[in-house]
Regions:
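N-terminal membrane-proximal hinge/A-helix region immediately C-terminal to the signal-anchor transmembrane segment
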Residues: 1-72, 356
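Cytochrome P450 catalytic core segment centered on helix I
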Residues: 156-225
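Conserved cytochrome P450 K-helix E-x-x-R motif and the immediately C-terminal K′/meander segment
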Residues: 12-25, 271-309
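Cytochrome P450
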Residues: 38-41, 45-49, 67-109, 116-134, 146-152, ...
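Cytochrome P450 heme-binding "Cys pocket" and the immediately downstream C-terminal segment
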Residues: 372-406
C-alpha cells in the first residue's frame, strides 16, 4: 500500500477546517498517491496522470461509483427514499424530456422576473436555487407543483431534504444521524403529501401525458392506493434531489463570474451563446469541489504509473477535482472561458492527461445532464442579464464552504447584489 497520510481525516469523521486543503496538504507531503484512514474507512487517493486514467477506467462491478454515491447520500437522506424506486434519476435526460424541461425553464424565468419586480436586492444563490426548484418541480412533480403556496411548501421541504448537505456540510452529518434524520423524514412526508395531491388531480383529469411525471405514475399503476401514492412521491423526491442542486449552484457561479468580468458579460447580453456556454463550462470547472470516488467491491488493481496497487474490498479509491482542475497546467487557477472550444479544452495536449481537467466528469463519472445544463445556464444568464442591470455587493470573490468535499461549490456566506430593470 502507498504511504498513509497520518493525521488526515475527512470532514464527516473529524473536524476539518478546509477539506480540500487537508487533502492538498497530504498530497504535498506524500506525493500523488497516498492512503487515508478516516473513521472506520480506508481511502486510496490518486492524482498522477496514469492513476487518474486508471481510476476512471475501473470496472463498475469491481469498484462502484453507484455504491459510493449511495453511501455518501445516505448520510443525509432517509433510507426509505432509496428503497424500491422504479423511475431513477438516470432516466431524466431523454431528448423529448429535455425539450420540455427547457420550456419549463422559460416559464420559470418569467415567473422569477415577475417575483423580482423592477428593482431590489437578492442573494445570487438563493435566486438560482429557487429557479432550479421551480423548473424541476414543473417538469416532474405533477400539476400545480410549481406555483403558489404549493411551490413554496415544496421548495422549503426540498431545502431541508437536500442530499448535497452530505458533502456540502459533512461536518453536520453527525447531528443528522443523532436525530435519526427527524427533520429530513418530516420534509419527505411533506413532499409525499403534496405530490399525492398532484396525483389525485392527475387522476381526476384523466391525463395521459407521457412526460416524466406520467411515466412515474404509470410505473406505480398496479399498486394499492397508499403504496402507489407514496411510491410516486418518493420517485419524484429522489429525482429532484439528484438533479437540481448542483445545477443551481453552477448557475450561481457563472452569474458571479460574469458580474466580475463585464466585457464578457456584455457579449453574453448581446447574444453570444457560444461564449455563454464556454463561461458556464469555465465557472463550473473552477467551482468543482467534487470527490470522485469508487467503493471497492472485489479486489482491483490501480495503476498509478510507478506502481500498481492491489486494493481490497471495502476500501474507497478517490481523486479530488478541485486539486486537479487548478494544478494540472499553468494558469488553470484563473477564469478564462477562451480555454474551451465548444465542450472541450482547446489545448488538451498541454495536459499530462486530458483526464486531469473537467467541468462535468469523465467516463462513468460524466454528468449525463451536461448538454441540458449548458443550455439551461445559457438561457438563464441571457434572460436575467438581459432584463436587469446587476451590481454586486461583494468586494472579493466569494469563497466556497470550507468543509465541502463534493459537488459544485456552495458559497460560504451571502452573495448579495442590487438589481434594476435595464
Amino acid at each position: 500500500m502507498p504511504p498513509y497520510a497520518e493525521g488526515t481525516g475527512l470532514p464527516w469523521d473529524v473536524s476539518v477546517p478546509d477539506a480540500v486543503a487537508a487533502i492538498a496538504a497530504a498530497r504535498a507531503s506524500h506525493g500523488d498517491t497516498f492512503a487515508v484512514h478516516s473513521g472506520q474507512d480506508h481511502y486510496l487517493f490518486t492524482f498522477s496522470p496514469t492513476g487518474v486514467e486508471s481510476f476512471y477506467g475501473l470496472p463498475e462491478e469491481k469498484a462502484s461509483k453507484g455504491v459510493a454515491d449511495y453511501l455518501m447520500l445516505r448520510r443525509k437522506l432517509p433510507d426509505e427514499i432509496f428503497d424500491g424506486r422504479r423511475i431513477l434519476p438516470g432516466t431524466l435526460f431523454r431528448r423529448d424530456d429535455v425539450a420540455g424541461y427547457l420550456t419549463n425553464l422559460d416559464r420559470a424565468l418569467e415567473q422569477t422576473t415577475a417575483e423580482l419586480g423592477s428593482s431590489g436586492s437578492l442573494d445570487v444563490f438563493d435566486l438560482t436555487r429557487r429557479l432550479g426548484h421551480r423548473m424541476g418541480l414543473a417538469s416532474w412533480a405533477g400539476p400545480g407543483s410549481a406555483v403558489g403556496e404549493t411551490f413554496d411548501r415544496l421548495a422549503r421541504a426540498f431545502d431541508t431534504l437536500d442530499g448535497a448537505d452530505a458533502f456540502v456540510h459533512p461536518d453536520a452529518m453527525a447531528a443528522v444521524a443523532a436525530s435519526n434524520k427527524r427533520a429530513e423524514r418530516a420534509a419527505l412526508d411533506e413532499v409525499a403529501d403534496i405530490v399525492a395531491a398532484a396525483v389525485r388531480r392527475w387522476d381526476a383529469d384523466d391525463m395521459n401525458d407521457q412526460g416524466l411525471f406520467g411515466r412515474i405514475v404509470d410505473a406505480w399503476s398496479s399498486q394499492p392506493p397508499d403504496i402507489r401514492l407514496r411510491g410516486i412521491a418518493f420517485d419524484v423526491a429522489l429525482i429532484h434531489i439528484a438533479s437540481m442542486s448542483n445545477l443551481a449552484a453552477a448557475l450561481g457561479w457563472v452569474l458571479v463570474d460574469l458580474l466580475e468580468h463585464p466585457a464578457h458579460l456584455a457579449r453574453v447580453v448581446a447574444g453570444d451563446t457560444d461564449l455563454a456556454q464556454r463561461c458556464a463550462l469555465e465557472s463550473t470547472r473552477l467551482a468543482q469541489r467534487s470527490i470522485m470516488s469508487r467503493t471497492v467491491l472485489s479486489p482491483v488493481s490501480l495503476d498509478t504509473g510507478d506502481i500498481s496497487y492491489q486494493v481490497p474490498p471495502g476500501w474507497t479509491i478517490a481523486t479530488l477535482l478541485p486539486l486537479l482542475n487548478t494544478s494540472a497546467a499553468p494558469g488553470l487557477e484563473n477564469w478564462d472561458p477562451d480555454r474551451w472550444t465548444r465542450h472541450r479544452l482547446t489545448d488538451e495536449k498541454a495536459l499530462p492527461s486530458p483526464m486531469l481537467v473537467t467541468a462535468f466528469g469523465h467516463g462513468r463519472h460524466s454528468c449525463p445532464a451536461q448538454p441540458f445544463s449548458l443550455s439551461a445556464m445559457t438561457a438563464a444568464m441571457t434572460h436575467l442579464f438581459g432584463r436587469y442591470r446587476m451590481t454586486p455587493s461583494w468586494t472579493t470573490h466569494p469563497r466556497p464552504v470550507p468543509a465541502q468535499i463534493g459537488g459544485v461549490a456552495r458559497a460560504d456566506g451571502p452573495c448579495r447584489l442590487d438589481y434594476v430593470c435595464g
